[in-house]
Amino acid sequence: MRLQCTFRKRMNKCLLLRVSLLLSLLCICAHVYVELKGLCLTAAVRLQKQTPNRRHQKAVTRTPLADAASTCCRPLKHHRRIHRWKIDLEPWAAETHDLQEEADRFLRYISTPQVSCERPASALPVFDREDHGSWVLCLDRRFSLAERIESKHCRVYSLRLGVEDDGLERLLAGSGCEVHCFDPSIRGAHLQDAHMWLHRLSVDWRDPNPAVPAQRLHSGTKKLAAILNDFGHRQVDVLKVDLESAEWKILENLILEQVLDSIGLLLLELHLHWAGFEVGGDEPSVVRYWFSLLRELERAHFRLYHSYSDPTKPRLFLHRNLRNTSSSFVLGWVNTQFVPQG
C-alpha cells in the first residue's frame, strides 16, 4: 500500500514537471511570436513613411523635364569636365632617342605655320605687325577676334613676370577690349587704368600650398581655371603667356584641365635655353615633352599661324649652340573651333 502511494506521488511530480516544462515552452514561443510581429509592424510603418517621400522626390526630379517638354528646346545639360592626369607623349623622333633628331623635329615644327591669317582691309593700321613687334594677332575674318575687337566685346588675359613689353595689352585696351594683366611684381593688389586691370596675382600650374601662410606670400597664387571661375569669365579671346620658362608647366595645366576650349587665341613665348621649371628628364626627353605639349594644342584644334625667332636673344638650346638657334621664340596659335559666347 505504501509502495503504491509512493509510486503515485512520484508520477504526479513527473507529470507536474512535464506540464511546467510544456507551459514554459509555450510561453517562450508566445513571447518570440509577439516580438517578431512587433518588428514586422515597425518595419511596415517605416516603409509607409518613406514611400511618399520617394514619390515626392521622383516627382520633383521629373518636374524640370516636364516643364521643358512644353517648350521648343531641351534643357541645358551641364557636363562636368574630367581632368586628365598626364599628357600623351609623342613617339620618339628616332629609335636612337638622339637629341639632334628630337631638336630638329621640334624646331621644324615651331618654325612652320599651319594656317595663314590675312589682315582684313577694315582693320586699324595699329594692328600691323611692324607696330607691335613679335606679338602678332590673327585678324582673319574666318575667325572671331577681328569682329570681337570691332564690337568692343573682346577679353584679354596677359600672364607675365615683370613689365617688359605691354604694348599689345595697351593697344587692345585702347581699342575697347577688357584687358586683365596678372603679374606678381606689381605694387597694388588690383589697379585699373581705363580698360586695363592689373592684378597682383601669380598664375601657377599647382594649387597654393596650404602649409604656407597667406601672410608670407607677396601675391596670390592660383591656377588659370580658378581665376576664370572667380572672375566669372567663361571665355578669353586672347591669352598672352610670357612667364620666363614657366610656360611649359602652365601649358600642361591648361591642357590637363581642359581650359583650352575657353581660349580663342594663344600667344606664347618659349624659352629654350634650359628645360624650364619642374621639367625633368634627360635632354632628348625634355625636347620630346616640349613637342608633345604643342601637339596637344593641335589636337585641341589650335593651329600655328605665327612664329618669331628673336635675333637679340642668346643662341642657346638646352645650354648649347644647336644650329645657331635662338633661345626665344614667340608663337601664335588660333583656336579654329572657338565660338564666342555673349
Please describe what each predicted stretch is.
Residues 2-342:
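Phosphate/nucleotide-binding beta-alpha loop and adjacent structural elements of enzyme active sites
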